[in-house]
Amino acid sequence: MHFPKKKHSGNLSVVELPKEALQDSLTAAQITFKRYAHPNGNAGSAERPRHLKVESAPVVKSEPSLPRMRQPEPRSINHQYSRETLPGHSEAFSVPTTPLQTIHYDVRNKASNSPSSIAAAETAAYLAHTNSFSNRSSGVGSRDPVMDTETKPPRAPSALKNELQLNRMRIPPPSYDNNVRSRSISPQVSYSTSLSSSCSISSDGEETSYREKSTDEAFPPEPSMSSYSLASKASAKASLTDPSQRQQESDYTAMNKLNGGNIIYKGTLPDLIPRSQRKTSKPRFKHRLLRSPEQQQENLSRVYSDQTQNGRAIINTQQNVKLKTTMRRGKYAITDNDETFPYDRKSVSSDSDTDEDSNVMEIKDKKKKSRRSKIKKGLKTTAAVVGSSTSVLPFPHHHHHHHQLHNPNSHHLHTHHHTSSHKFNEDKPWKSHRDLGFITEQERKRYESMWVSNRYSYLRLLPWWPSLANEDDESHLQPLNLPQDGLMLNLVVKDIWYRSNLPRDLLVQIYNMVDTRKDGTLDRKSFIVGMWLVDQCLYGRKLTNELDQRVWNSVDGYVLGTINVKPATSDHYHNANNPLDKPSKLSVRQELKNIKRDLRNVRI
């Protein structure tokens, strides 16, 4: 005879029952059925009833002498956990972790004649009868090696279910009196009946085990244990402990790692997330970002307030380690209202606060310093320009140009550029561009350096230069009228000007404008003016047909008090030859605009 596989609702472990335990359970079920089927003592009747009826069930009275049940041999834990496969059948058996609650009530309340005890006893007898009758075709000793899966146990009568529902509230709590326990049926009977009831056949989807339907509705659930050995040991020691101690043990087993691991450590170890809350502690990423700090504080207070209500074990260590910084946010962050951490929390947030404040202060100081330096530079340049002793211009707004002409380091003091000083960049000459109409001192020095380094080069290539053959004949030598500063060959000038990448026709036009000797060479003045015209073309100015005399004069001397005012022919007071005469109204307006623009550029 074989029992089918039944998966326990509480624990998912499947354990095969040994052959000796199967035989003992079947024997106990048969004895229990015979006893309750024939209460008058006719236990030896050959024919057994097929169904039990609650209406005609006789009242079982407590008898002084009860039949002694055969005690099974004690087995060790390793023997109970051993798996044995029956021949011809590969399925495993599922053993319940705890005995049925109805069987405990029947064993412990055997002496009482209450209808609840009678109903519980009849339920156990019915379960034993259905399993033994459906699976056994011959005597107790003879068992079929092959299980017939098509046979189904008869359904429980409706009267028995109604009686269980009526007596649900009248079932007394289990008593742990040693006298009553000694006069009741031995624990092997309850063990066998619970085993047989849990091993019922469940082939169809609509037909489930009787234990899940009846016991869950009629009796309150108890914390089940996760192994067969633990259940047997706990039932053996139940009578030796008081109810308070049993409650503590049940709480401990419920809090143990075998049943979820709801143990919270505090002190040296951080707060561990319980296994039951891991799914709920990982919400969506959107809710994490959009969650307000008030909700985080509520979640934190709820977690610490539910520790004692849920009966979780809190392990407080003696060494309370204070961590200054942490990466954990949300409901696991430390707050001022949290009483579970006794140490001071001021130093926890002091590091981050001081770092942020110091960074902000440093940025503010840098901004203030940069602004102060700019104001100081503006004041210095303004004082240098206004306080110059060489300012003899007729109009006060022309002091910029006057200072630029006499101060070689003041090329940055103009209305179109910043006040910060910078050197001339040959690759970017337009950054130092000023539309003055003449050559400044800095430009002249730059051009003169190129003149000095390239003059007197390759002059022997000239046709009019005396050759080496004529040097021996001193009578035919004629003195050369060379300028004091020297000469530069036109081929050298062409090579230098080609570096500007200007069009060739434009360079030819510039050369023709500055060539005064007409002998294939350029003197110092022509070379400097030609270089200045090349730079003006690079700055974007158009080349004029004639050069102003101021440009030629600025090569050898300084230009003082130059006013760029175009003569107006409509004004009869203006004389082009006298720049100090009364200007026109249009020029006055233009000068006022220049003054206002200069005042805006000066940063005070």
Curated annotation (Swiss-Prot):
Boundaries of every EH domain copy: 469-559
One Pfam family linked to the record: EH
The keyword Lipid metabolism appears for this protein: yes
Range of residues in the leader sequence: none
Keyword hit for Lipid metabolism: yes
Chain segments carrying region Disordered: 38-77, 132-249, 267-299, 338-380, 394-428
Basic residues composition-biased segments: 276-290, 366-379, 396-421
Cited function: With IRS4, acts as a positive regulator of INP51 activity and phosphatidylinositol 4,5-bisphosphate turnover. Negatively regulates signaling through the cell integrity pathway, including the MAP kinase SLT2.
Protein's recorded name: Protein TAX4
Organism field: Saccharomyces cerevisiae (strain ATCC 204508 / S288c)
